[in-house]
From Swiss-Prot:
Keywords tagged on the record: Methylation, Ribonucleoprotein, Ribosomal protein, RNA-binding, rRNA-binding
Subunit text: Part of the 50S ribosomal subunit. Forms a cluster with proteins L14 and L19.
Pfam families assigned to the protein according to its UniProt record, in alphabetical order: Ribosomal_L3
Native species: Nitrosomonas eutropha (strain DSM 101675 / C91 / Nm57)
Positions bearing N5-methylglutamine: Q154
Family, similarity comment: Belongs to the universal ribosomal protein uL3 family.
Membrane spanning stretches: none
Start and end residues of each stretch annotated as Disordered: 131-155
SUPFAM superfamilies assigned to the protein according to its UniProt record, in alphabetical order: Translation proteins
Protein name in UniProt: Large ribosomal subunit protein uL3
GO biological process terms on file: translation
Length: 217
């Protein structure tokens, strides 16, 4: 397990490679990541680094959080996230209040991005589960977009849990793995990732080094 960063989704754009091909990218703002707490296996039972990003007014946080930030000597942040790391990865340069910048990710490396997906509201089975529509005519009068049978009759006489049906779509925690880092802007604290990531503009996301890519190596 390695250290990650807290980011904010700025939006999507495209950049051109040297060969002239267009690459769609998502821009994430990962600036001002500050260390709030350093956990060790001896004291806390496991090793981790707790980070915060953004800024929040003091009257908008609880007294417990206010004291937590004060002990670290950092300004109150909007988001707090804990990243589990190996004990030997905690070096002497990592101290409370120090900033972690985007340089921990290299161009061409792979990352996993977690966030809350865009909520779509109440959706049918075609949009939610990729079901197919029935015939538009030729014997079909009122069953064009219905899901079909959802269970048996008297035995068992119920709908099994997990049955794909209509319901709320989106608005859940989602992770996309093995996203390529196309560009890193150390001056503005931006990272450009190939393709899309969960959430809408302004949403908070968490970026970690790719788990699957690390296992392959």
């Amino acid at each position: 397990m390695k250290l990650g960063l807290i980011g904010k989704k700025v939006g999507m754009t495209r950049i051109f490679t040297e060969s002239g091909s267009s690459v769609p990218v998502t821009v994430l703002d990962v600036s001002k990541n500050r260390v709030v707490q350093i956990k060790t296996a001896e004291r806390d039972g496991y090793s981790a680094i707790q980070l915060t990003q953004g800024y929040r007014r003091k009257n908008r946080i609880t007294k417990a959080l206010s004291g937590h930030f004060a002990r670290a000597g950092v300004e109150a942040g909007k988001v707090i996230k804990e990243f589990r790391i190996e004990q030997q990865a905690i070096n002497s340069d990592l101290k409370l209040g120090s900033e972690i910048n985007v340089e921990i990710f290299l161009t061409g490396s792979k990352v996993d991005v977690s966030g809350v997906s865009i909520g779509k509201g109440y959706a049918g089975t075609i949009k939610r589960h990729n079901f197919s529509s029935s015939r538009a005519s030729h014997g079909n009068s009122r069953s064009h977009n219905v899901p079909g049978s959802i269970g048996m009759a008297q035995d068992p006489g119920r709908v099994f849990p997990g049955k794909k049906m209509t319901g709320r779509l989106g608005g859940v925690n989602s992770t996309i793995q093995n996203i390529e880092v196309v560009r890193v802007d150390t001056v503005r604290g931006l990272i450009f990732l190939k393709g899309s990531v969960p959430g809408s503009k302004g949403n908070g996301v968490f970026i970690r080094p790719s788990v699957k890519h690390a296992n392959k190596q």
